[in-house]
Amino acid sequence: MISSKNDDIAAIATAHGIGSICIIRLSGSTALQSALKLTKISNLSPRLATLTKIYSLDKEFLDEAIMIYFKAPASFTGEDVVEFHTHGGFVVADMILNELVKLGVRLAEPGEFSKRAFLNDKLDLAKAEAIQGLINSRSEAAAKILARQMRGDLSRYVEQMRNELVKTLAFVETSIDYADDDLPDDLLEQIKTMLEANAAKLDKIVQISEQRRGLIDGFKVAIVGKPNVGKSSILNSLLSYERAIISDEAGTTRDRIEENFKVGTHLVRIIDTAGIRKNAGKIEKIGIRYSLAAIEEADIVLAVFDSSSASDEQDERIVELVKNSGKKVFFILNKSDLAFKFDLDLSPSIKISAKKGADEIVGRLRDYLDSQDSSEMMLSSNHQIKQCKDASVAIKRALNLLGDELELFAYEINTAIAAISAITRSFERSEILDEMFSHFCLGK
């Protein structure tokens, strides 16, 4: 559990390992005094890089480093913050950190700097989530979306909607207090229009965020088809190394195989699945269930068929399955270097042989992924999506009560305000904050 104390905390803010620079971050009401005790200087000017020698409490020289002082409240945490920019590697940095601990500075817990920034109104929850997401982002699209959220785009969106709901609640509660006076019809219509618009906005942002979740987490691509149509060969070709066992024996792939690779600027997680067929053994049937589950969770499906064989009932079943999945489907006609016998119309399709044609698949994937607009407002976490869904449901319940049950209407609007506010503002339960910030890295 993250401490709620206002004591001085410190952590190494850069990744452990060999590098040219290592940064130690120190925050708290006496951070400056603690930092100066490891030097022979008497003060630091705010926001000015100062080159100085660092000593242990026993006056042993440790390093020559740059120190920067951020005076409260003009710092990341809102407290006094001092940074030591030491030479890289973790040995020297750990030695300096140990000296700070001897002075009574506490080692920070993961996310504690960001939690202090939040508690000191330097950061809201949406921006905090964006910072952590940006640190962990693995594609340009994700970085751009999260940078906009960190800039405050989502926070402004939430605050505008919250203010409209609060204004509505004020009108209604005034009417409840003066029960003899009914709300004017034109005001009821204005409230109805505003609530319908906000519910529609919430539904839209949830839909966009769920549909384009792959822009942040990476797109899942499932390779499906009958046994022995070349799914594993295609996987190996896309990855440019032998990840899956290839055999002429049908049903070689029984376990689900997952690997990440880049398609242009996008992260893709590709899933090779067991072949789908009727007469499968017990273990293979389990693999087939995994295949069906992979289609369900995938953003994109590569449906692979053997173009050198006539189509059969199993092929028709797979075509129907993927077409009804609601996912983006690319039909791959493999073994196109052999005589063409496949007689199902799968236009448009990609004709390849397992060892040739991966570039065309990658090109089609890249074109499709590039077409996914990342400029629209998006929610970056499951928490944000849930809060928007809850707010939308509460608003719709309120609409059904408008003009009749005003006390219940006010309750539902309060519920909607609480749900939407939780995207940027404090939760009532401190343990939820602890859970969120505990996933941050040290020094953040």
UniProtKB/Swiss-Prot annotation:
Its cofactor is K(+). Mg(2+) binds at S232, T253. SUPFAM superfamilies: P-loop containing nucleoside triphosphate hydrolases. GO terms for biological process: tRNA methylation; tRNA wobble uridine modification. Its EC number is 3.6.-.-. GO terms for cellular component: cytosol. GO terms for molecular function: GTP binding; GTPase activity; metal ion binding. Binds 1 potassium ion per subunit. It is found in: Cytoplasm. The keyword Protein biosynthesis does not apply. Residues 218-370 form the TrmE-type G domain. InterPro entries: G_TrmE, GTP-bd, GTP-bd_TrmE_N, GTPase_MnmE, MnmE_dom2, MnmE_helical, P-loop_NTPase, Small_GTP-bd. It comes from the Bacteria. (6S)-5-formyl-5,6,7,8-tetrahydrofolate binds at R25, E83, K122, K444. It is an enzyme of class 3 (hydrolase). Belongs to the TRAFAC class TrmE-Era-EngA-EngB-Septin-like GTPase superfamily. TrmE GTPase family. Homodimer. Heterotetramer of two MnmE and two MnmG subunits. This is tRNA modification GTPase MnmE.
